[in-house]
Every structure is written in C-alpha cells, then in structure tokens.
C-alpha cells in the first residue's frame, strides 16, 4: 500500500499557498493546544499543515477535525525518534492516521506504543531518582495536566520547582543520577513499518546540527544504501539559503522528496508556524493527495524566502535550554 492510494485528493493549491509540515503540540514537548494551533493556522491563511509530535499522535485526530471546520487541511504525521549507525535520527512520517485498525498499519502503530511505554517508564524512573536525591516534584501532575507523564514533563517540573534553571540542566541532573531519557526505534524497522502503512518517511532538520547532529552527504548515501527513506526536510526555520540549496540538491540528485517545516512548539517558541510556499514541497504534497500548480518561473531559488536565516543567525539553537536542546534525549 502506498500513500497515493489512500490519500484524499484536495483542490489544487496555488504555488504560493502557505504550508507548514512540521508542528508540535502539547502531546509531546510543545505548548500549542490543537485548537490554538489550528486557529492560528486558519487566521494566518495556511492551506495545509502537519502535526508531527515526537513519538505521539495524540493531537492528530482533534487537529484534523478542527482543520476541516476552519478550512485548513491537516495531514496526519509524527516525528519518530529512531536509531541508526550509533546515533539518533528524527524521522517525519506523514500520511498514517492513528485510528487505523488494519493489518498494514499494525506494526507502525506498535512502534509508537512501544516508544510511549518506554518514555513513561523513563519518566517514572527519573522522578524517583530526582526525589530520592532530596528534590521533590509535587507539581508533576499539574505540569502533565492529565497527559501521560513523559520525561519532558519531569524535566519541566524540576525547573518549576526551582531545582534547575533550564531543560539542559534538568537532563544533566537525571543523567548524573543514573537515569536515562533515551527512547528510540530502529530506523530500518520504522521505515519498513511506515511504508507498509502507506506512510512517507522524511529525515527531519538534516542541517540543524545541534543535539541531533547534521546529516552529511556521506551519511545520506550510506543510509540510502540499505534504508529507502523518501525525503529530506530541505526547508527549515533556521536554514540559510545556502543550507536550503544544499539539501534541495542532495534530495533531487537522489530522487528524494522535499519537505518544509518550522518545527514550531508554541507561540514564538522557537518560531510561529512559517508560511512555506506549497510549490517548494509540491512532490511530497502530491504524494499526500494535495496537488499543487507548478509556476512557470523557478520553483525556489535563493532570496525567495524572506524568513530565511542570515549566515550569522545560523548557529546552534536554544542556548537557554528550550525544548530543542534536549529533543534527542527527551523526545
């Protein structure tokens, strides 16, 4: 089964219609509620977006329903924490609904369930270690707010209680106490399961180069030799034009799709959803049932994105310990 066979075909988008295919909510380490996020998208005239929480699709169905009501097409997605070649990789998987009950989707949904169970266990272990060290966490239930308690909530509670200043210090505290926040699935297994379910697999933020590490051309070729990933997130909030050009070239030279995402976690954290032009990722959108009119002029070239980072701005992000500092270890 492939995504084209199961996607709902939408009216054709214009080349400059706004899309953002990498957004987070409070289902993982974000602070947008589905209602707040979809309302923002509608108010700012986005046509298509994708909710890609870390290892969770708990917000997807609500966001899809709200999107239908407000005129924003929400593509089901998830950012799966995977491992390959001795390190973690964030994999954006598009096109798989969390309410699937068919055999084709069973393995992929099982991977997410396994990650959820491991994250809950890691969170409870971290809580016990922190409290045993004399640092109580009485507001943990308040911080989790009825959601499954994941490591991110434990870290956030440690900050709220004044035990540490930021997420990086919180993660270091748990590591020093012998705990772990790592939960990931084998990349090859995840891609295979996603493809069985009709999903499309895109390597997230290959040029970011902070806690999750940048992707080199050699990395990509070694990966493609054994794992059939489908694309690269070649447009990203922190990329300069030179980085976007590099990852578009790496994708096109290898027949890969291109995705566009802000990685917004909350209002202005690190950024609001970005209005990427639909034609910049038209191939991916078409595979997901969203056709795009291709302009007669250049699809993308340097200078087209007014929000592209300047070279001096393209540095390691989140120096003060915002969620991206510890994404690789906390999901």
Over which residues does each language-model region extend?
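Terminal or standalone catalytic/regulatory effector modules within metabolic enzymes
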Residues: 158-163, 173-179
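Active-site glycine- and acidic-residue-rich loops that bind
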Residues: 144-148, 176-185
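Short, flexible active-site loops
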Residues: 111, 140, 171-178, 204-205
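Charged catalytic cores and adjacent phosphate/nucleic-acid-binding surfaces used
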Residues: 1-39, 44-46, 58-76, 80-100, ...
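Extended, charge-rich helix/loop segments that form flexible
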Residues: 120-168
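Polyanionic/metal-chelating signatures
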Residues: 97-133
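Short, acidic loop-to-helix structural element flanking the phosphoryl-transfer center
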Residues: 181-195
């Amino acid at each position: 089964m492939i995504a084209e066979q199961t996607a709902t075909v939408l009216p054709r988008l214009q080349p400059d219609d706004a899309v953002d295919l990498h957004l987070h909510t409070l289902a993982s380490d974000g602070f947008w509620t589905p209602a707040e996020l979809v309302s923002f998208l509608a108010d700012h005239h986005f046509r298509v977006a994708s909710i890609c929480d870390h290892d969770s699709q708990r917000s997807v169905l609500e966001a899809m329903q709200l999107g239908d009501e407000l005129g924003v097409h929400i593509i089901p997605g998830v950012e799966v924490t995977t491992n390959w070649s001795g390190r973690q990789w964030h994999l954006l998987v598009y096109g798989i609904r969390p309410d699937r009950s068919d055999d084709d989707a069973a393995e992929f949904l099982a991977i997410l369930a396994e990650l959820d169970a491991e994250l809950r266990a890691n969170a409870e272990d971290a809580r016990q270690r922190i409290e045993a060290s004399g640092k109580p966490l009485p507001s943990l239930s308040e911080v989790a707010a009825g959601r499954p308690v994941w490591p991110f909530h434990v870290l956030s509670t440690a900050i709220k209680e004044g035990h540490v200043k930021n997420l990086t210090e919180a993660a270091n505290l748990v590591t020093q106490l012998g705990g772990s926040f790592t939960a990931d699935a084998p990349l090859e297994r995840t891609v295979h399961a996603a493809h069985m379910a009709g999903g499309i697999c895109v390597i997230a933020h290959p040029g970011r180069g902070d806690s999750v590490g940048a992707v080199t051309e050699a990395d990509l070729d070694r990966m493609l030799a054994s794992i059939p990933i489908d694309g690269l997130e070649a447009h990203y909030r922190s990329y300069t034009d030179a980085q976007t050009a590099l990852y578009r070239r790496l994708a096109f030279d290898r027949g890969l799709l291109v995705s566009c995402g802000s990685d917004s976690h909350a209002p202005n954290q690190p950024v609001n959803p970005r209005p990427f032009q639909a034609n910049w990722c038209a191939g991916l959108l078409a595979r997901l049932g969203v056709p795009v009119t291709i302009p007669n002029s250049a699809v993308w070239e340097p200078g087209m994105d007014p929000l592209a980072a300047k070279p001096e701005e393209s540095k390691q992000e989140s120096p003060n310990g915002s969620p991206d500092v510890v994404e690789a270890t906390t999901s």
